[in-house]
C-alpha cells in the first residue's frame, strides 16, 4: 500500500502551525503574523506589499488581511509610495522590534523541541528530499 505522502505532509504542516499558534498566543500573535513580521524584518527596508507577498509565497489579498491585523496592533505602518500611488511601503514600528525578538525565541525553542531526536544528517537529508519534491512539483506546474 502506498503512503499518502501529500496527506501526511499536509497534516504535519497543520499540527506544526497549531503548535506555533498556541505558543505565540501569550504574545497575541499567530504563526501567520510571525511569518509576515519575520519577512518584513529580514527583507531590505521599505518593501512593497507585492514584494512581501512574493517573498512569503502567498497571494496579495491574503497578505492584506494579515497586514491589517498587524497595523491594528501597532506593529507595522504602511505608506503610499510616492512614485506609484497604488503601491504601499511597509515598515516595522518601534513597538515591533522587541516583540520580534520574543517571537524568534518562541519559534527557535519550538523548532528545537520538534527536531529533538533527529540527527543533523537526518535533517539534512529531509531538507534535500523536500527540495527535490518542490523542484518536481514546480517542473510539473510549468509543463501544465
Swiss-Prot record:
Residues 49-72 bind DNA. One of its GO terms (molecular function) is DNA-binding transcription factor activity. Keywords: Activator, DNA-binding, Repressor, Transcription, Transcription regulation. The keyword Transcription regulation applies. Coiled coil: none annotated. One of its GO terms (biological process) is response to stress. Transmembrane segments: none annotated. Residues 2-135 form the HTH marR-type domain. Transcription regulator that can specifically activate or repress expression of target genes. Belongs to the SlyA family. Homodimer. This is Transcriptional regulator SlyA. The lineage of its organism: Bacteria, Pseudomonadati, Pseudomonadota, Gammaproteobacteria, Enterobacterales.
Amino acid at each position: 500500500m502506498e503512503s499518502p505522502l501529500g496527506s501526511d505532509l499536509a497534516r504535519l504542516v497543520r499540527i506544526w502551525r497549531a503548535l506555533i499558534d498556541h505558543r505565540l498566543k501569550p504574545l497575541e500573535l499567530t504563526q501567520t503574523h510571525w511569518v509576515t513580521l519575520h519577512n518584513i524584518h529580514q527583507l531590505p527596508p521599505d518593501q512593497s506589499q507585492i514584494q512581501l507577498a512574493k517573498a512569503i509565497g502567498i497571494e496579495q489579498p491574503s497578505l492584506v488581511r494579515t497586514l491589517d491585523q498587524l497595523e491594528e496592533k501597532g506593529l507595522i505602518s504602511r505608506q503610499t509610495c510616492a512614485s506609484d500611488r497604488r503601491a504601499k511601503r511597509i515598515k516595522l514600528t518601534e513597538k515591533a522590534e522587541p516583540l520580534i525578538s520574543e517571537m524568534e525565541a518562541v519559534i527557535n525553542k519550538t523548532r528545537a523541541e520538534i527536531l529533538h531526536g533527529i540527527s543533523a544528517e537526518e535533517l539534512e537529508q529531509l531538507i534535500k528530499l523536500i527540495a527535490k519534491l518542490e523542484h518536481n512539483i514546480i517542473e510539473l506546474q510549468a509543463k501544465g
